[in-house]
Amino acid sequence: MTAKPQKSCQFKRDYPQLINLYPPCALTTAQSLDNLTRLRLSRLTTQSTQPIQGLCVMGQWGLGDGLELLSLLQHWQTQTQTQGNTRLLVKVFEPNPINDYELKLLWDQSQSLISKSHLQPIANAILKAKPARIIGCQRLIFDDGRITVDLHFGDLHTALSQLPHSADHPIQQWLVLPHLAAQLNGKQVWQMARLSTDDAQLIGVNLAETLQQLAHKSGFSTLNVSQDALNGDASDALQSHIITDEILLHERKLLRQQADTAQAFTPKPTALATKDHPIAIVGGGLASANLMLSLAERGQSSTLFCKDNELGQGASGNRQGAIYPLLTPENDELSRFFQQAFLFSRRRIEALSHASMMETEAAPTITAISHDFCGVLQTGHDERSQQRLDKIIQSQDWPAEIAYAVDANEANEIAQIGIDKAGFFYPLGGWVCPFEYAKAAVDKASQLANVQCHFNTEITEIECDAKAWYLHSQGQRFGPFRQLVLANGAQLTQFSASERLQISPFRGQVSHVPAQFKLSQLATVLCANGYLTPSHQGLHCLGASYVKAAEHLDFCPQEQWENLGKMQESYPNQAWVDDIDISDNSARVGVRMVTRDHFPMMGCAPDVAEILARYEQHQLNQQQAEQSKHYWQTTPAPILDGLYILGGLGSRGLSSGPLAAECLAAQLTGEPLPLDWPTLNKLNPNRMWLRKLLKGKAL
């Protein structure tokens, strides 16, 4: 059963409000819109900024009603022959977040797609991706990675200034939409320049002279297009200005260096992956599978080493897992990251599920993913938890597609069983089978790139020799690999190179409960003191225990009773709770790796021995604290070259794992990231040490 969908009244903005924030495309005819898109693409092929290593990166200032974006994506889809294997990444910066419901309302009410019906398929794909009204970047992937759209919502200067520069794949061209052109100032244009190639061009329709001057002063060439030119009436109505000022280009270089120096404590890979050298991945769960898929979408080969006979036998082995974002009252980096990650994972699941239904002779079978986006209903279970939940609800004006408050009657209607208390409903959440998710990701990766999986291969030792990594397993030696990723869950700290990572194992026992009587009517995931899923194949999942440094992974009768007790405490006097039967002693035990700050670990493996050695050298006394802080702030943090960490997903790996894997894949291949510097700093595997060192504190 599926919970009833959220009501449209949850969305606050009507069409007149939307049309003011997202003005219609100035190019009213299909011909003029197509001409603008063709012009943009033709300028790419005439510049030295042709697609770099199979990836073309374009920027867009403003979303408007989205037609310029739709036209670009549609042209890219239909130009398979001319573009070859080149992929497209479009980074759109829009100050006013918008969701799929509002986008559809905008398109329907304006009837803007009626005369441009060729854009309807890609418009439907955008709507299906369900962009949300959240702050930050939302990465949308289409056509098996051939097209990627990054929607950067929120303050424009913040979005630009906090975005890492990609030296290998900078932005090659910008389109400035008229309704936001007046908001561009010198600081923003310089940040755009920092993120761009030195000969990137800024294109716009009827660009103001002041904006063109700003662009020229930061080293941008400009192309000012008139309406007549796009209507095909005056081919000479293109005003192009080429800027080749070496001083301005040097200032751009300094700006990039300053940004890199300011974030030196979050190191970048020292050498990028190449397609003819596979990346080694140790692990067999959701994180490693999604990393393999993200790499494959880039054409990057990889080799997986899994200690079990199939994927998803560790923490990813549960029958059902809840998927929904972690929110905080402050809506801080943690909360914003989990919203971005949850939405990304949800899109992954839907894309893989669609692919599993499209079996052909040319494409091997993709594992079907059991899942139901039936929503997640969160309620308090005691006074303290209720106060915390109330604080989360009341502290922010949460987008309704992320979560909204419900009263007791609405909670009962959503759950289809007696709840009788108010709560917080996550309408896009639900449950998914983690091990099927992992298998589907690897199945899809095998269609896109050269991937290999070694099962029943437990890696017991890793070593670095001459800047290459070798893996040892039962007398076998694998390698050399230029890049090695440790994504092996509970075994993450088993190697000498990773044993000091500040991360802890927690045992979790999930109980399997027969679906019967009123309990079987549950239509949404319940989250209170523990969680309870709707039935799947005749069983509910109830859990989970949370035991640090457990001595064994055997079934524990006490934890089985504790799982039941949590539901009894959360929903007292409800008849359906009496239907929870744990007498079969059916359960599954796994270990999840947890960090103190609840962020996953993603990025370069820290050289902890070198960090401690430098600490002894630079943290000699209190008088040198400021000097030490400056050293750690501006000096690249020590890393183990070629070794990377992807782990610490905790109890919300279904939400956080796929985006963390996507970001690591982008780092390994030198591509632009969908995360900003503050979030990357929080994900940095060295953060527990560097956080103190950057403040001049003792370790």
UniProtKB/Swiss-Prot annotation:
It catalyses: 5-aminomethyl-2-thiouridine(34) in tRNA + S-adenosyl-L-methionine = 5-methylaminomethyl-2-thiouridine(34) in tRNA + S-adenosyl-L-homocysteine + H(+). The keyword Isomerase does not apply. It is found in: Cytoplasm. GO terms for molecular function: flavin adenine dinucleotide binding; oxidoreductase activity, acting on the CH-NH group of donors; tRNA (5-methylaminomethyl-2-thiouridylate)(34)-methyltransferase activity. Its EC number is 2.1.1.61, 1.5.-.-. GO terms for cellular component: cytoplasm. InterPro entries: FAD-dep_OxRdtase, FAD/NAD-bd_sf, SAM-dependent_MTases_sf, tRNA_MAMT_biosynth_bifunc_MnmC, tRNA_S-uridine_synth_MnmC_C. Residues 1-260 are annotated as: tRNA (mnm(5)s(2)U34)-methyltransferase. It holds the Pfam family DAO. The keyword Transferase applies. It comes from the Bacteria. GO terms for biological process: methylation; tRNA wobble uridine modification. Its cofactor is FAD. Keywords: Cytoplasm, FAD, Flavoprotein, Methyltransferase, Multifunctional enzyme, Oxidoreductase, S-adenosyl-L-methionine, Transferase, tRNA processing. HAMAP family: MnmC (MF_01102). Catalyzes the last two steps in the biosynthesis of 5-methylaminomethyl-2-thiouridine (mnm(5)s(2)U) at the wobble position (U34) in tRNA. Catalyzes the FAD-dependent demodification of cmnm(5)s(2)U34 to nm(5)s(2)U34, followed by the transfer of a methyl group from S-adenosyl-L-methionine to nm(5)s(2)U34, to form mnm(5)s(2)U34. In the N-terminal section; belongs to the methyltransferase superfamily. tRNA (mnm(5)s(2)U34)-methyltransferase family. In the C-terminal section; belongs to the DAO family. This is tRNA 5-methylaminomethyl-2-thiouridine biosynthesis bifunctional protein MnmC. It comes from Shewanella sp. (strain MR-4). The lineage of its organism: Bacteria, Pseudomonadati, Pseudomonadota, Gammaproteobacteria, Alteromonadales.
